[in-house]
């Protein structure tokens, strides 16, 4: 078949493609569907909200209620900002960490996906032919158009090699604003 699989619909933990083949959906929309596809409670809540409006550029009362709930669960949260995507959340966090620390660089795990922001996608698709030295992974552009400045400001640490990662972080500690980590990085070969 010359084409990728196209989804027709999903139910629970399964997705059925346009040819009627049903599969377990291990991706779950990049882990955002923790309740599975078309969970009745979720469908009911979303349907009720759609009668009130589908999207707003303004804040809503539901955001305040949800923010207060999150704040009540973690005493260290001071403020919450809702955004439209994980990419936007990562962009805001990286900018905030740079502003707070006054440091220019970030560190991230080789192969981990954190969205489509130039800095977050560095070394997302690295391969053995561009890994660099074992103790010093290279910053690799995911595609043409990534500025050299983004590559220069991202320190890449290896996945599942704590001592090497700590050594690299220690080497760059004076320049690092933050370390971008995904505890379940599905794109680096982690199989839960």
Where are these predicted regions, by residue range?
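Short beta-strands and strand-loop turn motifs
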Residues: 24-27, 178-184
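Short, basic and Ser/Thr-rich N-terminal targeting/leader segments
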Residues: 8-11, 150
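PLP-dependent aspartate aminotransferase-fold enzymes
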Residues: 68-175
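Glycine-rich loop-to-alpha-helix module at the N-terminal edge of alpha/beta enzyme cores
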Residues: 22-104
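Residue-level signal for inorganic ion chemistry
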Residues: 46, 154, 179
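Short, acidic, Ser/Thr-enriched surface-loop or helix-capping motifs
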Residues: 17-18
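Active-site core of PLP-dependent enzymes with the aminotransferase class I/II
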Residues: 161-168, 184-192
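Active-site-adjacent loop/helix segments that line or gate small-molecule/cofactor pockets in enzymes
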Residues: 1-9
């Amino acid at each position: 078949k010359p084409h990728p699989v196209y989804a027709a619909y999903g139910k629970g933990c399964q997705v059925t493609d346009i040819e009627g083949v049903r599969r377990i959906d291990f991706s779950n929309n990049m882990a955002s569907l923790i309740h599975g596809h078309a969970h009745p409670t979720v469908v009911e809540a979303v349907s009720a909200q759609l009668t009130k409006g589908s999207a707003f550029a303004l804040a809503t009362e539901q955001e305040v209620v949800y923010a207060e709930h999150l704040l009540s669960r973690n005493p260290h949260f001071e403020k919450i900002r809702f955004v439209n995507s994980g990419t936007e959340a990562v962009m805001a966090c990286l900018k905030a960490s740079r502003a707070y620390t006054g440091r220019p660089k970030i560190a991230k795990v080789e192969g981990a996906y954190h969205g489509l922001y130039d800095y977050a996608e560095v070394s997302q698709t690295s391969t053995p032919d561009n890994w660099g030295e074992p103790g010093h992974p290279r910053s690799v552009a995911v595609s043409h158009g990534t500025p050299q400045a983004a590559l220069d400001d991202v320190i890449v640490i290896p996945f599942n090699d704590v001592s090497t990662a700590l050594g690299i972080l220690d080497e760059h500690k004076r320049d690092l604003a933050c370390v971008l980590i995904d505890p379940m990085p599905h794109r680096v070969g982690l199989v839960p």
